Amino acid sequence: MTGGPIASWRTAAQGHLTPDENGDLKTDYSRWRLLDDRGRQTWHYLESDEENEKWPQSVADKHFLGLPTVTPLAPAATNRMFAIHELPELPKAKTPLQCAENGLEFFSKLQLPPGNWACEYGGPMFLLPGLIITYYVTNTPIPPEYATEIKRYLFARQHPEDGGWGLHIEAHSSVFGTCMNYVALRLIGVSEDDPRMIKARGLLHKFGGAIYGPHWAKFWLSVLGVMEWECVNPVPPELWLLPDWVPFTPWRWWIHIRQVFLPMSYLWSKKFTHPLDPLTKQLRQELYTQPYDSISFANHRNSIHAADNYYPKTWLLNLINQLLVSVWNPYFRIPALVKRAEEWTWELIRMEDENTDYAGLGPVSNPMNMVACYLHDGPDSYSVRRHRERLNDYMWMKNEGMLMNGTNGVQVWDTAFITQAIVVAGFADDPKWRPMLTKALEFLEDHQLRENVPDQEKCYRQHRKGAWPFSNKTQGYTVSDCTAEGLRSTIQLQEMHNYPRLISVERLKDSVDCLLLMQNPSGGFTEYETTRGSEKLEWLNAAEVFGGIMIGYDYPECTTASVTALSLFSRFYPDYRADEIKAAKDKAVKYIKRVQRPDGSWYGSWGICFTYAAMFALESLASVGETYETSEYARRGCEFLLSKQKEDGGWGESYLSSEKHVYVQHEKSQVVQTAWACLALMEAEYPHKEPLQKAMKLLMSRQQPNGEWLQESIEGVFNQSCMISYPNYKFYWPIRALGLYSRKFGNEELM
């Protein structure tokens, strides 16, 4: 049996392919379309001319693909990654409010029919390889347009200096990134003799070969059949049989690591391996520095290169792994116990798939679930077919090619913040923007979670009735700050600006009920569910490339968002659970003050980094009456930000802040972080205009003639070490900051 081939074109579409600047084949970008079906976003390549004519490209399609949005009068820019999209030029903004309106004029063109906005959610460089390996081992033909554009994207993200790939698009090369992306390229048909592959292979060998990859790399390579399972540290499904009261049982772990461990443990127990074929036989020769048969894989379970070892395994975890290998597996892992563990693990996989209609929590666990379904249900089963369809929800097309998003989108998150930006900037009552905001409200209404999942306790899910998810209701996981921002956006439109009451008061109360259930005894809020275990579980962190992943931690951003939303709710509904809301806010504010550092900063876990957290923290303190003039905490937060302002008036923070846990200046000011810092200072009622005025001038100077801002450095982060893109941030945060400045200081002429 061989792996999944690249599918054939349905028509003569191969004739659409043309060489790109690197000599790689490229599809005809005028044939790509994004379909947004009630928040489910999938890309489609129209092979026939008839299809192409019936479904014209939208402005949003062209923007995402880096195409000009009207016929350019001048030759198109050669570097489409940073090129200006040729919407008509707008009158040059002279005031902050004009600049905000020009930005909104551009950004409004990108709203999709259901009312949401879309974007890539890229950055991590380990997602596509898991997908490609899944396609291969489940004999799933890869659509030819996917293969063509995935190849282009991976080569576009190869480091030109050393030929490798990193954990994310701005990271240094590592074994994880280099090995996995090399394998992905080989599986989609790239020759080992391609000069770029030779360079990548040379770097991998310099690192010591694939045996020096982290745990997740070794897992995927073993599934593919190019590494032996003896090289993978144990992932026993028996842990799922432990009573719930045990302090280290998996239900206590952070949701993402739990959902990855689930199918990983099932496949590890089954020792599923794709049968050897000519290509995987070749890969066995290419990935190592010595003959495959001479490698003692069992001796390399703990081998890892320093470039990958962000969070080294503890002595305790190494001891546990050794005991599992030497004692548990050979002497105590009896067949009856294994059968029970595999059956229960499979039941949990099945519930996750059914609760999300096979969309899954995220792009790491979902391909693993598909392999588990392939093994358990068979290649032609409904579960495998549905997974194949749902994996398309994670794919994204851009000018560089096709990537895999970090979730199945950012729909609710972006739409809520865009709504708030327009309100804060003062545009919500303008009849021009009312249809757009009404559509956004319709989208938020559609994606509020109206009921809990079946068997909630059995599958360890958090209460979700009344919540909003990060992406869409199909994925359907409660997220505390998404719930807070959805609640806040709804109240702003319905209560403050008389938009249609699409979401009833009872449903707003459901949202508040959900938020109150998510607070931890510490006063803080996690993102997906309350904290279920001790921080000591971090001693069992086996991922090596990520930190802070074993439990759901309190996050300043989630806590502050919840405080701000609850404060707004109580303004309009002061009698609903008033004492409980006050108590929750009091505890949360104490947490926010407690985690402020001596220098006045807060560490942000979902955006870069101290700038991001300061914006949320200072706004939440202001919502309870603590501002620059009245609160030492707010004052110190403002002074910290002011100490980081650059000469040009902007702020720029490197992603290294997230890794190193100290503020690291970016070499350039960044539009997004400048907006964050300004919003933080203005919400805290910082009284001096001069620093803010300088920042406004920078934001205005970076705006393009059509109203957009260009992509700069990466904006988001997760697990301390992996960065992720939020490209819509460069639109709505500056719009919000510019509009708020004009409201606070007057719409003065600055340019």
Swiss-Prot record:
Main subcellular location of this protein, as a coarse class: other
Protein name: Lanosterol synthase erg7A
Pathway this chain belongs to: Steroid metabolism; ergosterol biosynthesis
GO biological process, one term: ergosterol biosynthetic process
Keywords linked to the UniProt accession: Endoplasmic reticulum, Isomerase, Lipid biosynthesis, Lipid droplet, Lipid metabolism, Membrane, Repeat, Steroid biosynthesis, Steroid metabolism, Sterol biosynthesis, Sterol metabolism
GO MF terms held by the record: lanosterol synthase activity
SUPFAM superfamilies the record matches: Terpenoid cyclases/Protein prenyltransferases
Organism of derivation: Aspergillus fumigatus (strain ATCC MYA-4609 / CBS 101355 / FGSC A1100 / Af293) (Neosartorya fumigata)
Record keyword Cell inner membrane present: no
Family statement: Belongs to the terpene cyclase/mutase family.
InterPro entries noted in UniProt: SQ_cyclase_C, SQ_cyclase_N, Squalene_cyclase, Terpene_synthase_CS, Terpenoid_cyclase/PrenylTrfase
One Pfam family from the record: SQHop_cyclase_N
PFTB repeat coordinates: 147-189, 508-553, 585-625, 634-675
Subcellular location(s) of the protein: Lipid droplet; Endoplasmic reticulum membrane
Enzyme Commission code: 5.4.99.7
Catalytic residues (UniProt): D481 (proton donor)
